[in-house]
Amino acid sequence: MSCPLRPSEAQEGDQLSEECGMLYGEYLMLDKILEAQRLLSEQNNQPVHDEHLFIVTHQAYELWFKQIIYELDSIRNIFSDVLEESQTLEILKRLNRVVLILKVLVDQVMILETMTPLDFMDFRCYLRPASGFQSLQFRLLENKLGVRQENRVKYNQNYSKVFGNDEKALEQIAKSEKEPSLTDLVQRWLERTPGLELEGFNFWGKYQKAVEKLLTEQKELAEKEEAETLKRYKLNDLEKRREVYESIFKVEVHEALMSRGERRFSHKALQGAIMITFYRDEPRFSQPHQILTLLMDIDSLITKWRYNHVLMVQRMIGSSQLGTGGSSGYQYLRSTLSDRYKVFVDLFNLSTFLIPRSYIPPLSTSMRSHLCNWGSANSTNIVSNGNN
């Protein structure tokens, strides 16, 4: 790399030397990276041109996976401690970086699609038994985000078995399963949202009353409908909506949904997410709301990447052939598009529980002051307890 202390007149290419340190290629270890494209098709002295593209694209994926894991680990470390408000901007920056990387990965599939099925068939036989299912980094990425083992689609065997006797890989998998995932840490953070305290602002109690008022008033309007068919439709719709709201108001119903994997966040964390969504315009909830939005973006982009991957696989090998690693190929990949693999599915479903702005419980003077106050002695972070 060029030395920042070198005089400007010494920046010319013919004057580069090692007196100030290593050069560009040495710093990036390009000799190793650029020599890592070994075409198996060359073994028969019949190199397949597109195998080079296949290797480079997947190596690029793995490098980006490494960067995403690096960012996620740093974010999880910040969340592991009491989260200071001054750190939320850093979390936003790193989450946004992950989002932008994932957008690159989604678009990168298009490069592979420049290869035709016949082009792929020319070297596919050399890939067995290697498979994308064996990507250790992608499994670590999933675990660190919060994909649970019980939610994974079965792949003939436990997903970690594909790493065979690779003790280092198995240790990393085991560690990623045991340590708190980003989902776990976000849940703990949401559970400490100021304003949920029963003896304080008691947002949840106020929210339940607001929902009851909304449903009661809408029922009264429905009963005034003269057309019997329309009246019956509106009353039935209101009854269904009441059941939906009761699924979050009744703890036992919420926990039953959690046990079935239909909800992931604890009851208290869900309350915090709803409160942040309602009062996102308040200064101290602005950045937390952006965090929740970026978490959904990450989930969305991973789903889009899976979907693009599914379509590419179907285009290359059809929907009935087995994958090179022995999986059902297209059928297996398509099954990973379900909500089972969405770690922040509860955030997507928050819109189900929204109410019109006019019904949102107004903040008390003390609570509004608390949410507008940055850095008071008793309220230095978003996860501290609000007393009013």
From Swiss-Prot:
Heme binds at residue 309. One of its GO terms (biological process) is ommochrome biosynthetic process. It catalyses: L-tryptophan + O2 = N-formyl-L-kynurenine. InterPro entries: Trp/Indoleamine_2_3_dOase-like, Trp_2_3_dOase. Its cofactor is heme. Its EC number is 1.13.11.11. Keywords: Dioxygenase, Heme, Iron, Metal-binding, Oxidoreductase, Tryptophan catabolism. Binds 1 heme group per subunit. Pfam families: Trp_dioxygenase. Pathway: Amino-acid degradation; L-tryptophan degradation via kynurenine pathway; L-kynurenine from L-tryptophan: step 1/2; Pigment biosynthesis; ommochrome biosynthesis. Substrate binds at residues 54-58, 124, 324. GO terms for molecular function: heme binding; metal ion binding; tryptophan 2,3-dioxygenase activity. HAMAP family: T23O. Belongs to the tryptophan 2,3-dioxygenase family. Homotetramer. Dimer of dimers. Heme-dependent dioxygenase that catalyzes the oxidative cleavage of the L-tryptophan (L-Trp) pyrrole ring and converts L-tryptophan to N-formyl-L-kynurenine. Catalyzes the oxidative cleavage of the indole moiety. Required for normal eye pigmentation. This is Tryptophan 2,3-dioxygenase. It comes from Tribolium castaneum (Red flour beetle).
